[in-house]
Amino acid sequence: MNYPNGKPYSKNKPLDGRKSSPFSSNIEYGGRGMTLEKDIEQSNTFYLKSGIAVIHKKPTPVQIVNVHYPKRSKAVINEAYFRTPSTTDYNGVYNGYYIDFEAKETKNKTSFPLNNIHAHQVEHMKNTYHQKGIVFLMIRFKSLDEVYLLPYSKFEKYWQRYINNIKKSITVEEIRKNGYHIPYQYQPRLNYLKAVDKLILDESEDRV
């Protein structure tokens, strides 16, 4: 069977030689050029409409520099700058749990550079984690088309290693070992809450 563009149909194959993740669906769709932010946005919309979770992207803080008032009842912003976010990208509620996470992409094939993370964001994640929030990083390796959930509890040691000038990145092998693979699928595109379910179970045992 051929598609309208003339290309033959073929079943999807695994991205690599890894065994199937317990969170995998039967179909892997891949990123297909979309950014991680768009994939998360689509997934969060699906969760909201399905009554599964309420998770939103936090607005980026803006510093207004110059405002013009052409009319007394109207203001026009002429100049403004995006400020460095003081917390993480996303937060919300899922099944009674507070969810808080940062999402990052990298073109690097072998590691995730930690200079992509700000110290005040890590401090926020630490404080939220100690209040029993579910805190993690979602990392996409663009060239590998792989997405992982890395819990804050696992990330913390790599951050300490970074600030102690021991190593400036987390290898993809370390992330695969300590994180949860999030496969692409149809709906939602990134069903990351299945990985969150596993994280909740694992951390409930660790925190006892």
Swiss-Prot record:
It comes from the Bacteria. InterPro entries: Resolv_RecU (IPR004612), Restrct_endonuc-II-like (IPR011335), tRNA_endonuc-like_dom_sf (IPR011856). Its cofactor is Mg(2+). Its main location: cytoplasm. It catalyses: Endonucleolytic cleavage at a junction such as a reciprocal single-stranded crossover between two homologous DNA duplexes (Holliday junction). GO terms for molecular function: endonuclease activity; magnesium ion binding; nucleic acid binding. Pfam families: RecU. Keywords: Cytoplasm, DNA damage, DNA recombination, DNA repair, Endonuclease, Hydrolase, Magnesium, Metal-binding, Nuclease. One of its GO terms (cellular component) is cytoplasm. It is an enzyme of class 3 (hydrolase). Binds 1 Mg(2+) ion per subunit. GO terms for biological process: chromosome segregation; DNA recombination; DNA repair. Residues 1-28 are annotated as: Disordered. Its EC number is 3.1.21.10. The record marks K104 as: Transition state stabilizer. It is found in: Cytoplasm. Mg(2+) binds at T87, D89, E102, Q121. Belongs to the RecU family. Endonuclease that resolves Holliday junction intermediates in genetic recombination. Cleaves mobile four-strand junctions by introducing symmetrical nicks in paired strands. Promotes annealing of linear ssDNA with homologous dsDNA. Required for DNA repair, homologous recombination and chromosome segregation. This is Holliday junction resolvase RecU. It comes from Staphylococcus epidermidis (strain ATCC 35984 / DSM 28319 / BCRC 17069 / CCUG 31568 / BM 3577 / RP62A). The gene is recU.
